[in-house]
Regions:
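Short, charged recognition helix plus adjacent turn
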Residues: 1-9, 13, 17, 21, ...
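Residue-level detection of the helix-turn-helix DNA-binding "recognition helix"
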Residues: 35-36
């Protein structure tokens, strides 16, 4: 089974705690996202911090053609 985009972001940051620290949220929030999904307001910060695209994190909000910013 392939890792989810959030799992890839956690791996890129090192740990869930490290990702939480990068985003200024609690580790519990990151854990919560595993079952509930990444909040819209966190997709771009996660992309900037880890390189996991906003499209992968929230394809409902960021269609593939919007992935590359100018």
């Amino acid at each position: 089974m392939q890792p989810t985009p959030l799992e890839r972001a956690i791996r890129a940051a090192g740990t869930g705690r490290a990702l939480a620290d990068l985003l200024g949220v609690t580790p519990m929030a990151v854990s919560y996202w595993k079952s509930r999904g990444v909040p819209a307001r966190q997709a771009i910060p996660i992309e900037k911090a880890t390189g996991v695209s906003r499209h992968d994190l929230r394809p409902d909000l960021y269609p593939a053609e919007d992935v590359q910013a100018p």
